[in-house]
Amino acid sequence: MDIIREIESEMLRKDIPDFKPGDTVRVYFKVIEGGRERVQAFEGLVIKRRGKGLSETFTVRRISYGIGVERVFPLHSPRLEKIEVIRRGKVRRAKLYYIREKIGKAAKIKELVQQPDKENNNTEETNA
């Protein structure tokens, strides 16, 4: 079993940003059409992450011309060019399947507001 883990650890990508369900991401994925290869961007809401190691995947959902489109991406795929986190969402679930039934504003996720560090604020106030 340790041999398998060693081989898997070599194949794991290190350039993946930290993102969770509820975040809006833009995924750049290499698409091969005929003999050509191009990069296609897919932007949407992360509704789930599953698995561990090489088999880890995440599902991104977006609305395209009024129709919901979901795409499952393998996290450590060599065809995955890069992932950009557009905005962080504030959710209390790991799987956001309920978003599939929501339409319009009801499907919006609240944005997570980053709190400033308390340590930095205390030092600024005492210095001023």
UniProtKB/Swiss-Prot annotation:
Tell me if Ribosomal protein is a UniProt keyword of this record: yes
Gene Ontology cellular component list: cytosolic large ribosomal subunit
Respond yes or no to whether keyword Transport is given for this record.
no
Write down the Pfam families for this protein, in alphabetical order. Answer: Ribosomal_L19
Q: Between which residues do disulfide bridges form?
A: none
Keywords recorded for this protein, A-Z: Ribonucleoprotein, Ribosomal protein
The entry lists its GO molecular-function terms as:
structural constituent of ribosome
Q: Which SUPFAM superfamilies match?
A: Translation proteins SH3-like domain
Q: Which Gene3D superfamilies match?
A: 2.30.30.790
Superkingdom of source = Bacteria
Question: What's a single GO BP term from this record?
Answer: translation
Q: What does this protein do?
A: This protein is located at the 30S-50S ribosomal subunit interface and may play a role in the structure and function of the aminoacyl-tRNA binding site.
Instruction: Describe the family membership recorded for this protein in Swiss-Prot or TrEMBL.
Output: Belongs to the bacterial ribosomal protein bL19 family.
Listed name of the protein? Large ribosomal subunit protein bL19
What organism does this protein naturally occur in? Caldicellulosiruptor bescii (strain ATCC BAA-1888 / DSM 6725 / KCTC 15123 / Z-1320) (Anaerocellum thermophilum)
High-level lineage: Bacteria, Bacillati, Bacillota, Bacillota incertae sedis, Caldicellulosiruptorales
Question: Gene name, please?
Answer: rplS
